C-alpha cells in the first residue's frame, strides 16, 4: 500500500495527488477502493490513524493517549481481528501514547517536540533483547508556546 502512495509522490501526478489527498473520508478500508479515495485512506491510515471503532472505522479527530480512548473507540493496534497482529509494527506520531513495546507493536514517539525524549530502539532476537535508547530534548517547544 505504501508503494502506491510512493509512486504518486515521485510521479508526474504529484500536484494533483496533493490537491486530492486531504480529508477524513473514506474512513473504512475496502480493498475495492480506487483512485483518490484509495490513496487518501492509505495516507490517513499510515500517518494519522490513532483510534478506530471495533469494526475498523477510522477516527481522525481524537489525539488522546490510548488510556484515554474516547467512548466507542480503541487504539488501532488493539482493534479486534487486526490482520497484522502477528507482525511487528514500529510506529510514531502519537506522543501522548509514549513508549510502548509489545511483541506486535513498538510505539517510538516519546514527545521530543514537546520536551520529552527522542527515542530509538536496537532490535535483538527476542522482545527481552530490545534496547530502548533515548536522548532528552530540553530545547523543545512546550505545548501552547
What is each stretch, according to the model?
Residues 1-145:
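Feature recognizes metal-dependent phosphohydrolase scaffolds
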